[in-house]
Amino acid sequence: MAKKKAFIPFFYFTSIVFLPWLISLCCNKSLKTWITTWWNTRQCETFLNDIQEKSVLEKFIQLEDLFQLDEMIKEYPETDLQQFRLGIHKETIQFIKIHNEYRIHTILHFSTNLISFVILSGYSFWGKEKLFILNSWVQEFLYNLSDTIKAFSILLLTDLCIGFHSPHGWELMIGYIYKDFGFAHYEQILSGLVSTFPVILDTIFKYWIFRYLNRISPSLVVIYHAIND
């Protein structure tokens, strides 16, 4: 009976780990058709206007200067000119389809992550008792560790999060989150987040050492500073 009670929180923790993946798989299959139909029927006209006025024009302006393109067209025979215009038309349609699929992909991933967050929040709320048991296990495990191992673990964690090489890890993590939500890659936003998060975490960590660790385990703070130096 005791083993069964101990197994329930472990099963609950395992379900929390794998539940987001299962929700994402089910939502992607069930929502993709509905979102695609809704986007193509309700948003098609607005989307095409946006693409024609911005993305398509910007792409072709970058590919070929308008003046050089005009001079090249004047030298073309009528048959080649028709083929040239047909090629531009096909490329424009293909470009619009790609951006249309990208918008659908963005909405699908954002909706899936939002649904996953709501379900996990409710799942965690109704399983507060099991989370309390898991928390007590973690606290007991940490309490049984020696101060040296605790200090080494804290130092390793802080070096990973706010150390010299941490911006590369933050860049990969934030980039993955952007991709998971279906957002485009913006270098300025990414650089701002990468340069801000480690500073905020460093400040919080120093405050935590000053207010919490100094009070409950002064020896741990001494060992940590000795290893860090």
UniProtKB/Swiss-Prot annotation:
Disulfide bonds: none
InterPro entries cross-referenced by the UniProt entry: CemA
Pfam families, per the entry: CemA
Gene: cemA
Cellular component GO terms, alphabetical: chloroplast inner membrane
Species classification: Eukaryota, Viridiplantae, Streptophyta, Embryophyta, Tracheophyta
Record-given protein name: Potassium/proton antiporter CemA
Compartment(s) of residence: Plastid, Chloroplast inner membrane
Transmembrane segments: 6-26, 107-127, 189-209
GO biological process: potassium ion transport
Reported function: Contributes to K(+)/H(+) antiport activity by supporting proton efflux to control proton extrusion and homeostasis in chloroplasts in a light-dependent manner to modulate photosynthesis. Prevents excessive induction of non-photochemical quenching (NPQ) under continuous-light conditions. Indirectly promotes efficient inorganic carbon uptake into chloroplasts.
Its membrane topology: Multi-pass membrane protein
Keywords from the named record: Antiport, Chloroplast, Hydrogen ion transport, Ion transport, Membrane, Plastid, Plastid inner membrane, Potassium, Potassium transport, Transmembrane, Transmembrane helix, Transport
Predominant location: plastid
Family of this protein: Belongs to the CemA family.
Single Gene Ontology MF annotation: proton transmembrane transporter activity
Reaction equation(s) it catalyzes: K(+)(in) + H(+)(out) = K(+)(out) + H(+)(in)
